[in-house]
Curated annotation (Swiss-Prot):
Disulphide bridges, residue numbers: none
Region: Disordered, residue numbers: 206-225
Transmembrane annotation, as ranges: 1-21, 38-58, 72-92, 125-145, 154-174, 255-275, 284-304, 318-338, 348-368, 398-418, 427-447
Protein name per UniProt: MFS-type transporter ppzB
CC per GO annotation: membrane
Gene: ppzB
Lineage of source species: Eukaryota, Fungi, Dikarya, Ascomycota, Pezizomycotina
Biological function: MFS-type transporter; part of the gene cluster that mediates the biosynthesis of pyrrolopyrazines, secondary metabolites showing insecticidal activity. Probably involved in the secretion of peramine and other pyrrolopyrazines.
Transmembrane listed as a keyword: yes
Amino acid sequence: MGLFTDLVLYGIVLPALPFIMRNRFHIPNAELQHYTSGFLATYAGASVFFSVPAGWAASKLGSRQLFLGGLVFLFVATAIFAFSTSLALLVVSRLLQGMSTAVVWTAGLDMVQDTVDPSQIGVTIGTIFATISVGELAAPVLGGVLYERGGIAAVFAVSAVMLAIDLGLRGLVIDKKAAVKFESPCLIRSSAERSDHVASAPTVVEAQERTHEGTPLLPQDDDDDSDRYKIDRELGSIVQAIPLLYCFREPRLHLAMLLSFVQALFIGTFDATVPTEAESLFHFSSLQVGLVFIALMLPYFALGRLAGQAVDRFGTKAAATSGYAFLVPCLLLLGLPEKKLVSKEANVALFCTILALNGIGLAVVTSPGYVEAIDVTTKYQVANPGHFGENGPYAQLFGFSSLYFFTGLAVGPLLGGVLRAKFGYAVMGAVYAAISGVTAIVSFLFVGTRRGVCWG
């Protein structure tokens, strides 16, 4: 629910942002793309800065408390955004929202990871993104309707109600790790018996050693050297404070983070350029711009779970390679509507169809980066019991993953905005198609496969 709320509050202002810039702050039309991209990048930049500290704090303090704090900051940021009377305050609101987003996502994903069976990570991540895509899908439409009918005050009122409900529900959640402290002795004995039974079963690493690419277990690879994940040296003070840093000796973890970066790069670009492109091509209102986002986000909802199952079944290599390869022609098509080869009505349909095709590709590439990163980290955790502390490595992992993701979300609006403003949507699409093609090749060659040695 928290991730859903966060995306709603992010997306609800997207169709209204260019109109707020023009109507409230009198930004000239020629500079709207620059300001819109800048504010989206400010949000993502704050998320980048706070992602790793949020992961560290969650690993030390627990995810539930941090999650609640993130939602409170999100409420404050939304209020400042709604009632700001200067561009400086608007920047402050985006900084606060970016900070709270880093906290909510890092702590939220850690809470999910703590309750999920390792062999179901792909479908779980896919299902989560499919579910929250409903918020991503509905938010721009809702924001367009609310802004057109009641102005920014109506947008804030709905956002505040959603946050209040989420905070109330979050107060009822008991963290899994904290719940163990209150279990009765008989429940603890029962849990211990179950643990003994599980201990006799093969671990994730052992199971993967007996499988090959194409079996339904996490991101399959041919990595059978478990000794390479053992820590056999004295660690420095920084690595002791942030144990996950040691895992970056494994090149696969860097590649997993790269996948998250590229995925977010594309998302940030669409978020920043679709509203201005739709207004420029078709002179759409904020409501109509919001409706255009349905074409991009609907495939997330329809295909997210299925794409996650494919990752669990066929591995991260197949999903990442096919997804980014599929995006290449879809991104190249982005410049077609601006040529106005058909009537306006047909051109609108063409624009939405192209966005939908890109949405399909984005749905496919959602899970591989997360699943690959979790797989590598799990190998280190199994090989080094106790190294990551009582709360495990996953909060720190999601902190670093969020760092890469939000870096992409920050770079996307800036790069996409500049390319669109200087050269047009066709050139922008061609540049991003090249990036997607290179990512597909890298995924085919290196993702989900054994690398010869660790770095460092």
